[in-house]
C-alpha cells in the first residue's frame, strides 16, 4: 500500500469520527468515503495491471494473486469404490485414493541396484555444492508453503539459513558423492488435487507429492548441474516447451500454430485449393506415475550426465513410499514402483528427458508441453493421411516399448480448412474422435 493511499484512508477515518461528533455534515463524510473507495479501486486495478504486465518475468506472483482471490476450495469426494460402495470419511477416502494411485504404477518392480551398468556418463567427477549455494537457496524458500512428511517447515529452514547452510552443504555433498539417499528423503505425503469430471471418481484426482524440503534444496542444486550437462552435450530437445528455460505455454502455441498456418499458406499457393490440416491432440494416461525407472536411467546414462548424479537419482527412485494426506488424516504407506514424483524438483525435468526420443520420421509437426503432445500436418490427399497415420503408429510403438499408455478416450483429431475430407485416424486399434474445439494449454482452439 502506497503512502498516498494510507493518507486517503486515514482521512476517511478522520471524517467518520468528525461526522459522529457532529463536526461535519453527512454529505461531507460521504464525499470522503467515495473518494477513498475510488482511490482504493484504482490502486487495486494498477496492482493487477502490473501483475499482468509482469507475468513473463514473474508468473508465480501473478498466479499467487489469482489463487488468493479464489474463495471456493475444491472438496474431495465422496468416492465411489469398485464394488459400488460410497466412502465419505476423510480417513477412508485417503486410504482408497492411495490404493487407486498405487494401482496405476507399472507393476514390474525393477532392480535398481548399482550394478555398474552406467557407462556412457561423464567421469565420476566430485560434486561440490558450496555453502553459499545452499544458503542462497535456503533464503529463497517460500515460508508459506507446506512441509513434507519429515515435518521440517520451510519457514524454520529459511530463518535459520545462515546457521544450517554449512552442515547441510556437507550432508548434500556426502549424499551425492556416495550415491546414498536417506530414507526420509524418499517418502512423500500425497495431496489429491481435483482436475475435472465427477468428484466421486478417484481417477479425476491428481496426486501431488509433498516431499521433504531439505531434499528439494539438494534437488535444485542437482537440477542446475543436470541442465548444464544436457546443454553442453547438445541433448536438449527443441520441441519440448514445458518447464524449459526460455520456453512456455505461449512459445508452444506460437511455434505450433505458426507451422500450421504456414501449411495453409503454402497449400493456397501451390495446390489451387485450400490446404487441409489435421491436428491430433494426444494425452498420456497417468504420465508421471508410469515412467519406468529402468528405462529412464538407461536414457539418462546416454545423455552424458555426471555419473555420481546418475547414481544419486537411481537411489532416489529406489524404495520410495507414499501416503495420502487428506484434511489431517493419513493413509497407510504404499510402495512406489514407477514414476517421478509430481511436486518434486527433479520430477519434471526427468520426465522431459524421458520423452526426448518420442518423435516422428516424417515432416509432420510434433510439439510437446511436458506430457501434452500435439501432432499436425497437411492432409489433402490419401497419401498425406497415410503419413500422419504412420506417425501416429510410431508414437504408439514408442509408448508400448517405453511402458507408457495413451489415454485413447482423451486423444482427439481436429480438421482445419475448406474442402476437408475428414480422414479418420487410429491410435492403435482405437479410432480417434473428431473434435471441433479443444482447450490447448488454456487457450480455446
Predicted regions and their residues:
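Arg/Lys-enriched, amphipathic patches
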Residues: 1-88, 140
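Surface-exposed loop/turn segments and immediately adjacent short secondary-structure elements
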Residues: 4, 54, 60-204, 209, ...
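Conserved catalytic palm subdomain of right-hand nucleotidyl-transferase polymerases, strongest
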Residues: 143-152, 201-210, 251-302
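Catalytic palm active-site di-aspartate
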Residues: 148, 187-190, 206, 239-244, ...
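Active-site palm subdomain of RNA-directed nucleic acid polymerases
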Residues: 222-240, 268, 348-377
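Conserved polymerase palm-domain catalytic core
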Residues: 284-368, 378
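Short, conserved micro-motifs composed of acidic
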Residues: 390, 405-438
